[in-house]
Amino acid sequence: MLCAIYKSKKKLGSYLYVANREDFSSVPSVLLEHFGKPELVMMFNLLGRKALHNVDCNEVLETIKRQGFYLQIAKQDDGLFNSLSEIK
């Protein structure tokens, strides 16, 4: 499965993974406001041989299937995205 990976210009080290390029319909609007305008980094095959940095491909794949997106945040986060369940 190919996915599109976007980085945040507002939040260093934060990445948003979606199933289809430019399709943010599953991403809550509040999250997108905090994330800022997503900047495409690459298209990535989650079922391929290459690994992702700091995140498990299977976890990303299952989360995208379940909720339509995956949010990767920096290890040193200030808590902005920690309440993702409240944003939904």
Curated annotation (Swiss-Prot):
Task: Say which domain of life the source belongs to.
Answer: Bacteria
Q: What is this protein called?
A: YcgL domain-containing protein HI_1446
SUPFAM superfamilies xrefs:
YcgL-like
**One of this protein's Pfam families, by short name?**
YcgL
Starting at the broadest rank, the lineage of the source organism is:
Bacteria, Pseudomonadati, Pseudomonadota, Gammaproteobacteria, Pasteurellales
Residue ranges of the YcgL domain? 1-85
